[in-house]
Amino acid sequence: MKMRTQYIALVLFVCILASCSQESVETIDIIKAENSKEVEQELLNVVNDHRISLGQNALEFSSIAYEYANAHSDYMVAKGTINHDNFSKRASDISSQVDAELVAENVAKDYVTASEAFEGWLNSSSHKNTMEGEFTHTAVSAKKDADGNLYFTQIFFR
């Protein structure tokens, strides 16, 4: 019952968060951007090292989360801006595929390295709370746009 209450509270929070921003109904042509595999692995390692330094578990890589992180990074590249558009749908889809009770994500742009993205998240209380949250799995997508700018999506779940 407690988990169900927490899940309902999370869904309500996401709905309220989503209602604060307007989502465009325009059609966007999504072109798959190239992944920066080294940056993705480095960011995953830095986040896990940070968690371990706090006495927390290292997060396991999830190919399901990676699929959704990639799709969202492609979407952000196509829009030219970072956002959490359609997060509630992503979270619901991931939850149904892996039976997750909680899903969260961090996004970033305008960082050249994984370390810079990590530091940016660490200096934001909400992003830091997500990185340090009680999660078991994650995946990081880092994609470059045509100008070489990196867009990051990290999805967490338990």
Predicted regions and their residues:
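Bacterial N-terminal signal peptides that target proteins for export
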Residues: 1-8
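Hydrophobic helical h-region of N-terminal Sec-dependent signal peptides
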Residues: 10-14
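C-terminal motif of bacterial Sec signal peptides marking the signal peptidase cleavage site
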Residues: 15-19
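A short alpha-helix/helix-coil micro-patch that ends at or immediately precedes a cysteine
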Residues: 23-77
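Solvent-exposed, polar/charged alpha-helical surfaces in well-ordered, non-transmembrane soluble domains
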Residues: 41-49, 67-74, 105, 115-120, ...
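Surface-exposed patches in mature extracellular/periplasmic domains of secreted proteins
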Residues: 53-67, 80-91, 128-143
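Short, surface-exposed glycine/acidic/tryptophan-bearing loops
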Residues: 70-114
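Disulfide-stabilized extracellular recognition modules
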Residues: 108-158
